[in-house]
């Protein structure tokens, strides 16, 4: 099966917001027992998987897109398969952890995916997930990214609780700085991307180049990190979940 999306190679897949979110996930990954087997679902272009492997874990991946799985095999040498998150082609308890970043919101059957994640995680293992938060923040960016939903905190907790996992953390992130970035920069860019081809738009090409500037991305990420000063506020554009399988 081949699945492609217009947003899959856009600058924000490489830019500061994406890098910041990967850092949030990795802060939890590094708490896992060393050397374990980690499934990244969906693996996408492999940015998270590469970091997980670099931290000393054995990485496996699944994605609905053949191109994504092939790219990861070639670029990382990791085992990556094409498949459906509601029917994971792995045995029960195969992994010490599953990571899933900005994926559940795309699925018609997110509950089925949560049950499958719980099935393939070993007893005592963890799922580390990020999703967009709060219906009140729905925008044209969600339409552009083909989201099915944004999550309330309790909805995410119940999703994994009903799948048989114990939620250890369900925390908002990204307020106020990332949310301001989303509103003032990312939303106008996504509206423009929805109407125009990057190859024919000088402004979008400039944004793409900026999104690949390590210095600029690092600077903006440092600014985003200031959001941690406001982490006590139960609000933000994203949610981080850590859930553990009862064992």
Regions found by a protein language model. Give the residues of each.
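Short, electropositive alpha-helical surface patch
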Residues: 182-191
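Conserved N-terminal segment of class I S-adenosyl-L-methionine
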Residues: 1-91, 97-101, 111-114, 150, ...
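C-terminal beta-strand of the catalytic ATP-binding
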Residues: 243-247
């Amino acid at each position: 099966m081949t699945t492609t999306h217009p947003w899959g190679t856009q600058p924000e897949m490489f830019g500061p917001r994406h890098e910041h979110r990967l850092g949030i996930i990795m802060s939890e990954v590094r708490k896992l027992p060393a050397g374990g087997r980690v499934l990244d679902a969906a693996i996408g272009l492999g940015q998270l998987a590469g970091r997980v492997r670099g931290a000393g874990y054995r990485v496996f991946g699944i994605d609905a897109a053949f191109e994504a799985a092939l790219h990861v095999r070639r670029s990382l040498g990791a085992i990556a398969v094409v498949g459906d998150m509601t029917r994971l082609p792995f045995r029960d308890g195969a992994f010490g952890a599953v990571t899933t970043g900005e994926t559940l919101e795309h699925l018609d059957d997110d509950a089925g995916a949560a049950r499958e994640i719980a099935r393939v995680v070993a007893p005592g293992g963890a799922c580390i997930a990020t999703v967009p938060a709060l219906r009140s923040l729905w925008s044209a960016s969600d339409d552009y990214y083909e989201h099915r939903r944004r999550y309330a905190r309790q909805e995410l907790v119940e999703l994994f609780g009903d799948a048989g996992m114990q939620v250890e953390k369900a925390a908002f992130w990204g307020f106020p700085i990332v949310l301001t970035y989303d509103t003032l920069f990312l939303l106008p860019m996504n509206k423009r991307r929805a109407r125009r081809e990057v190859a024919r738009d000088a402004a979008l090409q400039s944004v793409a180049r900026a999104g690949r500037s390590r210095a600029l991305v690092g600077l903006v990420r440092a600014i985003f990190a200031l959001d941690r000063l406001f982490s006590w506020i139960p609000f933000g554009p994203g949610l981080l979940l850590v859930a553990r399988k009862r064992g």
